[in-house]
Regions:
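Short amphipathic alpha-helix that is part of the acyltransferase structural core
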Residues: 1-18, 55-58, 103, 112-150, ...
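N-terminal charged segments
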Residues: 1-72
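A short helix-loop-beta-strand connector motif used in the catalytic cores of GNAT acetyltransferases and
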Residues: 23-33, 75-77, 100-102, 154-164, ...
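Conserved acetyl-CoA binding element of GNAT-fold acetyltransferases
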Residues: 45-58, 182-193, 252
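Acyl-donor-binding surface of acyltransferase catalytic domains
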Residues: 57-121, 126-128, 222-223, 228, ...
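Conserved acetyl-CoA-binding loop-helix of GNAT-fold acetyltransferases
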Residues: 60-68, 188-191, 197-214, 237, ...
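A conserved beta-strand-loop-helix scaffold within acyl/acetyltransferase catalytic domains
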Residues: 143-194
Length: 257
């Protein structure tokens, strides 16, 4: 597991650890410790692969039967996220797994990105606006409560920095960053549909890069859906414009149906 996967796994595990007790029970959250790797699950949404996934699995298939039994016991499907070209791909293929969505992993230092003019302002979210932040994130996911309280909890959690973009007083975009020593991960970014194409995500990327530098981070990681038919999506283009470079493709593998 390299630094890009390591900080992603750190972010996901700390996100699950941040869930308030009522959210933990309402969503039936669980984590399976696999040593350097982990499986995590949201039982209330058994087909939601983002939160029913395995990260950090190394070459070999020793843990796969345990993982399969665990997700089956929870009634959830899942995805195994691994780097394209890893030996484990052959093992998964032999077990009847199939390719799902591919994500591009990106990396960069904490040098400031080019300044882009925007009519929007960005602000780090503290306790007093955490509820508003969570409400918008939940709306972007289309899940509502209690997802709002889960994301709101990150705004005051150590090793996290949550930012929002505002159109005057209206909160229209959200994004989060997780820091662990000299590594940082950027994710959970989105903009309300009626406010897109106004530079919100570019501004939020810049704000998080600055925060990462202030926190002592030296290497930043993020990921977004890979090119489709060779064409990058808006998120992919935003990340490149912010100075990230493509590292490699992370493939999601789905178990046999």
């Amino acid at each position: 597991m390299d630094d890009l996967e390591r900080i992603e796994l750190s972010a996901v595990l700390d996100f699950f650890a941040a869930a308030p007790p009522d959210v933990l029970h309402a969503f039936d959250l669980a984590v399976l410790d696999l040593g350097d790797a982990a499986a995590f699950s949201i039982g209330a949404h058994p087909k939601m692969l983002l939160f029913n996934r395995v990260l950090g699995l190394e070459e070999g298939d020793a843990a796969l039967p345990q993982i399969e039994r665990w997700f089956a016991s929870r009634g959830c499907t899942f995805a195994v996220s691994i780097r394209t070209g890893a030996v484990l791909e052959g093992v998964l293929d032999e077990r009847g797994y199939r390719r799902g969505t591919a994500f591009m992993k990106f990396r960069r230092g904490v040098e400031q990105p080019p300044v882009r003019r925007s009519p929007l302002r960005t602000e780090q979210i503290r306790e007093e606006r955490a509820g508003d932040y969570g409400t918008v994130v939940a709306a972007l996911f289309g899940l509502g409560s209690p997802l709002d309280r889960w994301f709101a909890a990150l705004c005051t959690r150590a090793r996290w920095a949550c930012f929002a973009a505002f159109d005057e007083s209206r909160l229209i975009g959200t994004a989060a960053a997780h820091f662990a020593d000299t590594l940082g991960w950027l994710g959970a970014a989105g903009t309300l549909e009626d406010a897109r194409r106004r530079g919100a995500q570019a501004a939020l990327l810049a704000a998080r890069i600055r925060a990462a530098g202030d926190a002592g981070v030296r290497l930043l990681a993020t990921e977004t859906v890979d090119r489709v038919d060779g064409i990058p999506g808006p998120s992919f283009r935003n990340v490149l414009r912010a100075g990230f470079e493509e590292a490699y493709v992370q493939q999601w593998w789905l178990p046999p149906e």
